[in-house]
């Protein structure tokens, strides 16, 4: 009995595929791929980002406050590290400077060329302070540099920091108080003092107060006394005339108000015969508490501002009828309050 064996499997490994490719391309010239220069330039541009420390100090104190409220001071970090470093992207145009606070970059802020940093004068010689003005939101950072041994900050540290800040931002190491005083002195010297010509102002009404008094040097003492007495008398008479003119104005004003008839709203609501022709109405005349003398003056001098639209002929006396009064042509301006005693 014959035993059937299993068929052999064809090897399909990587070497076999490579062998088959050589057999297919046997006798053909090799094909070279074209050279692409862009691929090489892309590879050359790929560089790792490098961080370079420009300045570092391990013992600083940082405080912050908003620009609108300088009294609201907050301590951000105390006894922490201060570092200024540069990030290089492989191109001179792609370099950025950053400010880092804390050992693990707890606070990081970019340093732009327009960033303003100023030195603050300190009372203590061992301290060195700078103020950094930040935006979005507007606030200030006060960085105090301290020495490790509680002594004076080394001069080398201050020089290195000032040299770095002067290159990457707007740094001012001058005392602001002295600088402002110098600026004000220079401004005062530069501005010339204006020459003001003082002229006497001519008043158009000055002739009313002027008195025709001759010079006292040419007048004897007796005549000067008489002139003084006459001037006092004239001033008293002038004051008296002013008082009299004020009384005349007040009296005329009272008479003008007296000609206005106070309107009684109750009687006008009961009768529909009356029509008000004047839009002016004084509220203070409607008060019922009016003195008897004032009411009598009103009846004598006031003029009616409201008349009946239809005149009641019964209220008119026979004497007026005999005079031949044409009531159809009578207007409200021609009728006085005395013509209608019933109102």
UniProtKB/Swiss-Prot annotation:
It is a peripheral membrane protein. Residues 1-48 are annotated as: Disordered. Pfam families: Inp1. It comes from the Eukaryota. This is Inheritance of peroxisomes protein 1. Belongs to the INP1 family. Residues 13-41 have a biased composition (Polar residues). Required for peroxisome inheritance. GO terms for biological process: peroxisome inheritance. The keyword Membrane applies. Keywords: Membrane, Peroxisome. Its main location: membrane. The keyword Membrane applies. It is found in: Peroxisome membrane. One of its GO terms (cellular component) is extrinsic component of intraperoxisomal membrane. Signal peptide: none annotated.
